[in-house]
Amino acid sequence: MRQNPERRAALLDAAIDVLASEGSRGLTLRAVDGKAQVPIGTCSNYFRNRDELLLQIMERTHERITPEPEQLARTMSAEPSRSLVVLLLRQVHERMQDDRSCYLAMLELRLEGTRRPALGKQLNDIFSSVLEENIRFHMDAGLPGDRIDVVLLYLAVHGMNLDDLTAPGVLAPYVGTDLFDELAQRLLSEDS
Protein backbone atom coordinates (compact mmCIF):
# COMPACT_ATOMS: atom_id res chain seq x y z
CA MET A 1 0.00 0.00 0.00
CA ARG A 2 1.19 3.46 -0.84
CA GLN A 3 1.88 5.84 2.03
CA ASN A 4 2.01 9.36 0.55
CA PRO A 5 -0.19 11.17 3.13
CA GLU A 6 -1.02 14.11 0.84
CA ARG A 7 -2.11 11.83 -1.99
CA ARG A 8 -4.13 9.67 0.43
CA ALA A 9 -5.91 12.78 1.78
CA ALA A 10 -6.61 14.00 -1.77
CA LEU A 11 -8.05 10.60 -2.71
CA LEU A 12 -10.22 10.55 0.42
CA ASP A 13 -11.45 14.08 -0.30
CA ALA A 14 -12.33 12.97 -3.83
CA ALA A 15 -14.08 9.90 -2.40
CA ILE A 16 -16.12 12.13 -0.08
CA ASP A 17 -17.20 14.23 -3.06
CA VAL A 18 -18.15 11.12 -5.07
CA LEU A 19 -20.08 9.64 -2.14
CA ALA A 20 -21.91 12.92 -1.54
CA SER A 21 -22.85 13.46 -5.19
CA GLU A 22 -23.33 9.90 -6.47
CA GLY A 23 -24.29 7.97 -3.36
CA SER A 24 -22.90 4.68 -2.20
CA ARG A 25 -23.57 2.89 -5.48
CA GLY A 26 -21.53 5.46 -7.36
CA LEU A 27 -18.54 5.13 -5.06
CA THR A 28 -16.01 3.01 -6.93
CA LEU A 29 -12.24 3.10 -6.84
CA ARG A 30 -12.31 4.11 -10.51
CA ALA A 31 -14.78 6.96 -9.81
CA VAL A 32 -12.47 8.24 -7.07
CA ASP A 33 -9.51 8.12 -9.48
CA GLY A 34 -11.53 10.19 -11.95
CA LYS A 35 -12.64 12.76 -9.37
CA ALA A 36 -9.08 13.08 -8.02
CA GLN A 37 -7.77 13.36 -11.60
CA VAL A 38 -5.16 10.66 -11.08
CA PRO A 39 -4.32 7.66 -13.27
CA ILE A 40 -6.77 4.76 -13.14
CA GLY A 41 -5.63 2.31 -10.46
CA THR A 42 -4.17 4.93 -8.13
CA CYS A 43 -6.95 4.55 -5.56
CA SER A 44 -6.51 0.78 -5.47
CA ASN A 45 -2.84 1.34 -4.62
CA TYR A 46 -3.93 3.17 -1.44
CA PHE A 47 -6.99 1.17 -0.38
CA ARG A 48 -7.17 -2.62 -0.52
CA ASN A 49 -10.90 -2.64 -1.10
CA ARG A 50 -14.07 -0.61 -0.89
CA ASP A 51 -14.65 -1.49 2.78
CA GLU A 52 -11.29 -0.03 3.74
CA LEU A 53 -12.06 3.05 1.66
CA LEU A 54 -15.42 3.51 3.42
CA LEU A 55 -13.83 3.37 6.87
CA GLN A 56 -11.11 5.79 5.92
CA ILE A 57 -13.73 8.13 4.46
CA MET A 58 -15.38 8.11 7.89
CA GLU A 59 -12.08 9.04 9.53
CA ARG A 60 -11.44 11.77 6.97
CA THR A 61 -14.90 13.29 7.40
CA HIS A 62 -14.24 13.47 11.14
CA GLU A 63 -10.93 15.26 10.46
CA ARG A 64 -12.62 17.74 8.14
CA ILE A 65 -15.46 18.67 10.49
CA THR A 66 -13.36 18.91 13.63
CA PRO A 67 -12.67 22.55 14.46
CA GLU A 68 -9.14 23.85 14.24
CA PRO A 69 -7.53 23.78 17.71
CA GLU A 70 -6.85 27.53 17.59
CA GLN A 71 -10.48 28.33 16.77
CA LEU A 72 -11.73 26.04 19.52
CA ALA A 73 -9.30 27.57 22.03
CA ARG A 74 -10.55 31.07 21.14
CA THR A 75 -14.16 29.98 21.52
CA MET A 76 -13.51 28.21 24.81
CA SER A 77 -11.76 31.25 26.29
CA ALA A 78 -15.24 32.52 27.19
CA GLU A 79 -16.83 31.69 30.53
CA PRO A 80 -18.89 28.47 30.51
CA SER A 81 -22.50 29.51 29.93
CA ARG A 82 -25.59 28.82 27.92
CA SER A 83 -24.41 31.50 25.47
CA LEU A 84 -21.19 29.59 24.91
CA VAL A 85 -23.19 26.42 24.19
CA VAL A 86 -25.21 28.39 21.61
CA LEU A 87 -22.00 29.60 19.99
CA LEU A 88 -20.63 26.05 19.84
CA LEU A 89 -23.89 24.80 18.27
CA ARG A 90 -23.76 27.57 15.67
CA GLN A 91 -20.17 26.69 14.85
CA VAL A 92 -21.12 23.04 14.29
CA HIS A 93 -23.87 24.16 11.93
CA GLU A 94 -21.54 26.58 10.12
CA ARG A 95 -18.99 23.80 9.56
CA MET A 96 -21.76 21.70 8.05
CA GLN A 97 -22.79 24.53 5.75
CA ASP A 98 -19.17 25.17 4.75
CA ASP A 99 -18.53 21.48 3.97
CA ARG A 100 -21.89 20.11 2.85
CA SER A 101 -20.35 17.28 0.85
CA CYS A 102 -18.66 16.00 4.01
CA TYR A 103 -21.97 15.79 5.86
CA LEU A 104 -23.78 14.27 2.90
CA ALA A 105 -21.04 11.64 2.69
CA MET A 106 -21.54 10.87 6.39
CA LEU A 107 -25.26 10.40 5.77
CA GLU A 108 -24.48 8.06 2.87
CA LEU A 109 -22.11 6.10 5.11
CA ARG A 110 -24.84 5.74 7.73
CA LEU A 111 -27.25 4.45 5.09
CA GLU A 112 -24.65 2.03 3.74
CA GLY A 113 -24.09 0.81 7.29
CA THR A 114 -27.73 -0.28 7.47
CA ARG A 115 -27.17 -2.55 4.46
CA ARG A 116 -23.77 -3.89 5.50
CA PRO A 117 -23.77 -5.16 9.09
CA ALA A 118 -19.97 -5.22 9.48
CA LEU A 119 -19.70 -1.60 8.35
CA GLY A 120 -22.72 -0.72 10.49
CA LYS A 121 -21.02 -2.10 13.59
CA GLN A 122 -17.82 -0.16 12.88
CA LEU A 123 -19.78 3.05 12.26
CA ASN A 124 -21.77 2.46 15.46
CA ASP A 125 -18.50 2.20 17.38
CA ILE A 126 -17.15 5.38 15.76
CA PHE A 127 -20.32 7.43 16.29
CA SER A 128 -20.68 6.18 19.87
CA SER A 129 -17.11 7.24 20.55
CA VAL A 130 -17.73 10.67 19.01
CA LEU A 131 -20.84 11.17 21.13
CA GLU A 132 -18.92 10.19 24.27
CA GLU A 133 -16.15 12.63 23.30
CA ASN A 134 -18.76 15.38 22.93
CA ILE A 135 -20.26 14.59 26.33
CA ARG A 136 -16.85 14.48 27.98
CA PHE A 137 -15.83 17.78 26.33
CA HIS A 138 -19.05 19.46 27.48
CA MET A 139 -18.77 18.20 31.05
CA ASP A 140 -15.02 18.87 31.36
CA ALA A 141 -15.54 22.44 30.10
CA GLY A 142 -18.07 23.07 32.87
CA LEU A 143 -20.81 23.96 30.40
CA PRO A 144 -24.38 23.95 31.71
CA GLY A 145 -26.31 20.71 31.43
CA ASP A 146 -25.78 17.06 32.15
CA ARG A 147 -25.05 14.04 29.96
CA ILE A 148 -28.66 13.70 28.80
CA ASP A 149 -28.81 17.40 27.91
CA VAL A 150 -25.75 16.92 25.70
CA VAL A 151 -27.36 13.91 24.00
CA LEU A 152 -30.53 15.95 23.38
CA LEU A 153 -28.48 18.81 21.90
CA TYR A 154 -26.60 16.29 19.73
CA LEU A 155 -29.87 14.83 18.43
CA ALA A 156 -31.43 18.24 17.81
CA VAL A 157 -28.43 19.63 15.93
CA HIS A 158 -28.14 16.48 13.81
CA GLY A 159 -31.84 16.74 12.99
CA MET A 160 -31.49 20.40 12.04
CA ASN A 161 -28.46 19.62 9.89
CA LEU A 162 -30.31 16.74 8.22
CA ASP A 163 -33.23 18.98 7.29
CA ASP A 164 -30.92 21.76 6.14
CA LEU A 165 -29.06 19.32 3.87
CA THR A 166 -31.95 17.33 2.48
CA ALA A 167 -35.11 19.46 2.73
CA PRO A 168 -34.12 23.04 3.55
CA GLY A 169 -37.65 24.32 3.03
CA VAL A 170 -38.79 22.53 6.20
CA LEU A 171 -37.08 25.08 8.42
CA ALA A 172 -37.72 28.08 6.13
CA PRO A 173 -40.67 29.35 8.22
CA TYR A 174 -38.31 29.63 11.20
CA VAL A 175 -35.55 31.65 9.53
CA GLY A 176 -36.05 34.60 11.88
CA THR A 177 -35.94 32.35 14.95
CA ASP A 178 -32.63 31.58 16.58
CA LEU A 179 -33.23 27.87 16.94
CA PHE A 180 -29.87 27.30 18.62
CA ASP A 181 -30.68 29.84 21.31
CA GLU A 182 -34.15 28.35 21.74
CA LEU A 183 -32.64 24.88 22.11
CA ALA A 184 -30.19 25.99 24.75
CA GLN A 185 -32.76 28.04 26.67
CA ARG A 186 -35.30 25.23 26.73
CA LEU A 187 -32.81 22.48 27.60
CA LEU A 188 -30.23 24.16 29.78
CA SER A 189 -30.64 26.23 32.90
CA GLU A 190 -27.76 28.56 33.70
CA ASP A 191 -27.22 26.86 37.05
CA SER A 192 -27.28 23.25 35.80
Regions found by a protein language model. Give the residues of each.
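N-terminal intrinsically disordered/low-complexity leader segments
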Residues: 1-6, 191-192
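Hydrophobic alpha-helical connector segments
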Residues: 56, 69-102, 153, 177
